[in-house]
Swiss-Prot record:
Regulation: Activated by phosphorylation at Tyr-216. In response to insulin, inhibited by phosphorylation at Ser-9 by PKB/AKT1; phosphorylation at this site causes a conformational change, preventing access of substrates to the active site. Inhibited by IL22 treatment which also triggers phosphorylation at Ser-9, promoting inactivation. Inhibited by lithium.
Catalytic class of the enzyme: transferase
Family assignment from sequence similarity: Belongs to the protein kinase superfamily. CMGC Ser/Thr protein kinase family. GSK-3 subfamily.
Organism encoding this protein: Rattus norvegicus (Rat)
Domain Protein kinase stretches: 56-340
Transmembrane domains' residue ranges: none
Gene Ontology terms, MF aspect: ATP binding; beta-catenin binding; dynactin binding; dynein complex binding; integrin binding; ionotropic glutamate receptor binding; kinase activity; NF-kappaB binding
Gene coding for it: Gsk3b
Binding site for ATP: 62-70, 85
Note: Simultaneous silencing of GSK3A and GSK3B by RNAi stimulates replication and promotes survival of INS-1E pancreatic beta cells.
Protein name: Glycogen synthase kinase-3 beta
Keyword Membrane: yes
């Protein structure tokens, strides 16, 4: 979690929020079974701002924290379950999470279906409500289940979950957006299909070179060392460090760097990676001069993990958990790593016998950071399948165009970004 209260994301613009004309209109009625039905005027998450009535029922609290409250509800028109994230809105500012989520459209990112505003109990209190895809599980809960049973998560699931996480990061990083809170709790899972969706963009920000950012960001176990060193000019590579921590945790069955404090977090990292060199410290934060840790040698990666851990998994981990931010793999490079070769096998299936989820429907936007990697990322059987399915290609093209529009909007909003 970030150091600031996450009741709302701070502004990318200091102009007052333009509330919808139907702001605050919330009708409560009963259906034929006597269940409470709430009807609001909501704006679709994507596309033009055309407010419409949305009715939902069966509301119950499924989570809360410093950010606000999350409810589960059922849409009356489709019967689909959704999650409604309710956060206190500072009327002086636009909500950064909302601005970012409206630009995103990817199979591995939780979708913003609608958003609406509602009144609070106090005078002038305004809440923003984000209506999102409901996904029943998280990587955190699934991993905890295996850990409590004294078992390790099957490697095929480690591959599927991490690959989809890297795809989601390749997508948001292509827009210059850094998530800044990658952790197992923010990776939603459908256990039947093995589809993973990245959620919680409450800490996310479009990073602009030369503009400072807060260093007290990201949950402790997953914080990149440059953040611990107080860097304010970090890049999206902090997400890749966090992803490396998630990968290591899935292989180990417990967090790899379980620090009790910021300094202790660094100690845990040094126990594995060894003491960083002066050059590595300079790469993390040129202004940091107070480094006085004892000289400790790096622990061999093969001894960090269990004896039967796949060598490719260890190799991938070592390329993510690097002190030097620029030495870490990019998300696309991670997807192309040999650890994921099994997923590119045309005969691979889920342990329950089902087909694997969509893994190769890359758009131009996703591949923009390194187009030549497409030769590895899209295996021959997927190319043949795509060529035989024009509607799928049309969807991909549509997604790409939507991504291009989002990139333009991002560039426009970046200049108004603040320094949190």
């Amino acid at each position: 979690m970030s150091g600031r209260p996450r009741t709302t994301s701070f502004a990318e613009s200091c102009k007052p929020v333009q509330q919808p004309s139907a702001f605050g209109s919330m009708k409560v009625s009963r259906d034929k079974d006597g269940s409470k039905v709430t009807t609001v005027v909501a704006t679709p998450g994507q596309g033009p701002d055309r407010p419409q009535e949305v009715s939902y029922t069966d509301t119950k609290v499924i989570g809360n924290g410093s950010f606000g409250v999350v409810y589960q509800a059922k849409l009356c028109d489709s019967g689909e379950l959704v999650a409604i994230k309710k956060v206190l809105q500072d009327k002086r500012f636009k909500n950064r999470e909302l601005q970012i989520m409206r630009k995103l459209d990817h199979c591995n990112i939780v979708r913003l279906r609608y958003f609406f505003y509602s009144s609070g109990e106090k005078k002038d209190e305004v809440y923003l409500n984000l209506v999102l895809d409901y996904v029943p599980e998280t990587v955190y809960r699934v991993a905890r289940h295996y850990s409590r049973a004294k078992q390790t998560l099957p490697v095929i699931y480690v591959k599927l979950y991490m690959y989809q996480l890297f795809r989601s990061l390749a997508y948001i990083h292509s827009f210059g957006i850094c998530h800044r809170d990658i952790k197992p709790q923010n990776l939603l899972l459908d256990p039947d299909t093995a589809v993973l969706k990245l959620c919680d963009f409450g800490s996310a920000k479009q990073l602009v070179r030369g503009e400072p950012n807060v260093s007290y960001i990201c949950s402790r176990y997953y914080r990149a060392p440059e953040l611990i060193f107080g860097a304010t000019d970090y890049t999206s590579s902090i997400d890749m460090w966090s992803a490396g921590c998630v990968l290591a945790e899935l292989l180990l069955g417990q967090p790899i760097f379980p620090g009790d404090s910021g300094v202790d977090q660094l100690v845990e990292i040094i126990k594995v990676l060894g003491t960083p060199t002066r050059e590595q410290i300079r790469e993390m934060n040129p202004n940091y001069t107070e480094f006085k840790f004892p000289q400790i040698k790096a622990h061999p990666w093969t001894k960090v993990f269990r004896p039967r851990t796949p060598p490719e998994a260890i190799a991938l981990c070592s390329r993510l958990l690097e002190y030097t931010p620029t030495a870490r793999l990019t998300p696309l490079e991670a997807c192309a790593h040999s650890f994921f070769d099994e997923l590119r096998d045309p005969n691979v299936k889920l342990p329950n016998g089902r087909d694997t989820p969509a893994l190769f429907n890359f758009t131009t936007q996703e591949l923009s950071s390194n187009p030549p990697l497409a030769t590895i990322l899209i295996p021959p059987h997927a190319r043949i399948q795509a060529a035989a399915s024009p509607p799928a290609n049309a969807t991909a093209a549509s997604d790409t165009n939507a991504g291009d529009r989002g990139q333009t909007n991002n560039a426009a909003s970046a200049s108004a970004s603040n320094s949190t």
